[in-house]
């Protein structure tokens, strides 16, 4: 495996004492790290939130090991899954094939509904109004590949790329992340979708 200069993973469980509430597991990267606490606050007394976030791309053996560890301790009622903003040295075919294998692993390991959340736009550093010409192209290619995988597997998709695309005022200057308003918008978007999904479960 090719590695990024810094690899990282985070696991966080909110409201572990609330056994009476359904639990949502967010799987993603630093975008999840940004909006998960806001989502947990919005959903307080309605659902508990947990997240596993990592810099690893699907297909990295460490990704699956760490994901299974993250999911081992507590049952979850709904999974919101994303991967795609890391591992840019791997092509779209690698991403597609390993995303499909990871999805199949989640489906066989956890008997709960799974939703897919696509990846958010990447802008040019210090120019939030401009999409990054190379990296955002990779994001759109991966989002298309992921959409095909999810459609075939009948996994619903939540389009956060479109939500964030026309709002440079929500972007941080690093090109990847979002300011507090952007995180709030993302959390509100997911809260509505995920509560509805739980109600239909």
PLM feature segments, named:
Residues 42-45, 63-201:
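Alpha-helical cap/lid subdomain in secreted, periplasmic
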Residues 2-101:
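Conserved SGNH/GDSL esterase-like catalytic core that processes O-acyl groups on lipids
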């Amino acid at each position: 495996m090719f590695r990024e200069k810094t690899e990282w993973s985070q696991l966080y469980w909110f409201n572990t004492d609330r056994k009476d509430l359904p639990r949502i597991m967010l799987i993603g990267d630093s975008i999840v790290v940004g909006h998960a606490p806001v989502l947990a606050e919005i959903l307080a007394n309605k659902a508990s939130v947990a997240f596993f976030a990592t810099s690893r791309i699907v297909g990295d053996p460490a990704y699956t090991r760490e994901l299974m560890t993250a999911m081992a301790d507590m049952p979850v009622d709904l999974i919101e899954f994303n991967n795609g903003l890391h591992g840019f040295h791997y092509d779209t075919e690698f991403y597609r094939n390993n995303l499909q294998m990871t999805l199949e692993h989640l489906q066989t390991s956890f008997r709960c509904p799974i939703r897919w959340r696509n990846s958010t736009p990447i802008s040019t550093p210090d120019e939030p109004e401009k999409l990054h010409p190379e990296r955002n192209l990779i994001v759109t290619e991966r989002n298309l590949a992921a959409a095909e995988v999810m459609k075939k597997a009948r996994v619903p998709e939540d389009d956060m790329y479109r939500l964030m695309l026309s709002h440079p005022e929500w972007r941080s200057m690093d090109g990847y992340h979002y300011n507090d308003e952007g995180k709030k918008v993302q959390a509100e978007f997911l809260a509505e979708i995920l509560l509805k999904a739980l109600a239909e479960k």
